[in-house]
């Protein structure tokens, strides 16, 4: 089975950046403990627009990690799987 990925978009206002950074650290620790990789990117042209990526070796691992996440995942059923190229 191929790797699976989820993507979540979040908009953060300037006064909330510090709290958001703490939340990201907590999520990073959670997903690492669950056997997943977690990345966050901020849009270059729109400060405060973030994309969060969580990757797992399979859909079941990612679903378990989302189910026990420290914050609710907006659409936990929306998963993307890696496409094997010929």
Descriptions of predicted regions:
Residues 1-86:
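Short S/T/G/P-rich N-terminal loop/turn motif that feeds into the first structured element of a domain
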């Amino acid at each position: 089975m191929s790797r699976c990925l989820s993507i979540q978009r979040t908009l953060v206002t300037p006064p909330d950046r510090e709290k958001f950074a703490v939340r990201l650290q907590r999520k990073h620790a959670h997903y690492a403990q669950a056997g997943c990789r977690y990345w966050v990117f901020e849009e270059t042209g729109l400060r405060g627009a973030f994309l969060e990526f969580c990757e797992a070796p399979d859909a079941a691992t990612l679903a378990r990690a989302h189910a026990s996440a420290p914050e609710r995942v907006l659409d936990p059923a929306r998963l993307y799987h890696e496409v094997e190229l010929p």
